[in-house]
Amino acid sequence: MTKQQKTALNMAKFIQNQSLLLLEKLNELDLDAEADLCEKLHDDAEHLFRTLSSRLG
């Protein structure tokens, strides 16, 4: 795996982790509509990370 590929994979993992943290905060604030959006974002980030992992693995 090249350095650029590792960087892309690390960025995808970072986005996945940060979106989960944001989701937790939004739930604590009872911001349901925003939490729903963030949950979709997290699901997409998770899918992206899995896809990149498989492709670049």
Tell me what each language-model feature is.
Residues 3, 11-57:
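Short, charge-rich amphipathic interface segments used for partner binding and complex assembly
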